[in-house]
Amino acid sequence: MENNSNSGVIYQGKIPNRVKYCFAFGALGKDLIYGMIATFSMIYFTDIIKVAPAFIGSMFFVAKLWDAFNDLFMGMIVDNTRSRWGKFVPWLVIGTLINAFVFITVFTDFHLSGVSLCVFASVVYVLWGMTYTIMDIPYWSIIPNLTSDPEEREKVSVLPRIFASIGQSLIIAGFGVQIIKGLGGNYTGYHRFALIIAATFIFTMAVCVINLPKKQQATGTAEKMKFRDIFTVIKKNDQLRWAVLLILLYNIGIQAIMGVATYYFSYVCNNAGMLSAFMISASVAEVVGLLIFPKVTKLLSRKKAFLMACTLPPIGLILLLIVGFVCPSNIPLTAIAGIIVKTGTGLELGCATVFLADVVDYGEYVLGVRNEGVVFSLQTLIVKLTAAFTALAI
């Protein structure tokens, strides 16, 4: 049943399955693109088109810092958008089309060298991040507007995370190397894979946009947000501050674990091939963690689900350390460690998305205005900042 009140929530109760699954399907394509950039862009720049590794490392750090704070601006722009299509759909369409084009450009060799190659790499990488943000912030900001029913919100929060994990963690991280080799390897493999991913991205987001509810919020003349108002939102919404702190601490821990994994298997276990067993099992486990999230919250509570999410990764890490020193070539135990770590991550992703959706409702109660864009931009800001500083530290 659709909501006819002034609230931004579209459905009072159950969300139609068509809307729910088509919305989630959009995350598959967008995280295929994100996974390709996150996993392979550095090695593509340094090993395929021969950009100096020292330059790429510094450029990536600066670009991620800029991209993180750019999220706040995009969140503000989304919240200020007034159009006949609402405040989310226009940016989903614009961001998807531009980002797909820039993504293909990233994996296209224009046979440059020296300074011109460094400039090219910098421009396309920064542009990719900015155009991805145009689409990503409004995508996640839709969730709190779909329903206020707690059980339905948990389901609609988890589904896109599942598709995102399938795209980024399972397909790209798990099988990306094999796919690139199968498509010709070297530059040809990267370029062909990029074309396939870009086409998939446009298709999945088209399915998402076409099936979104026609009723959209923010077509009126409410006062527009200014940049300084972002800090007012953070200051007056105490639940937002706590949610951001929890997400920050969790991301620091989990990104540090995953960031050192390659070096751990290479230098502690002396077996870099074990990384594959760890990553594939971990990728599957993340999806499983997301799948069981609604059941866990129903049987226990969201609080206990989050405590499980915080407890499982350290347990998996301790097991991994023991395996590394006692039996470094033991594939089953390495896989089990990966499963324990990323099952917790799956639960955390579900918790974080639901927390932020609830924070939007709380903010409307406290401030009298819904700030979906700003609230969800803080999550992506945290993820990008922790990724940048973790990579620099490692």
Identify the residue ranges that each predicted region occupies:
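Membrane-embedded alpha-helical bundles of multi-pass transporters/translocases
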Residues: 2-394
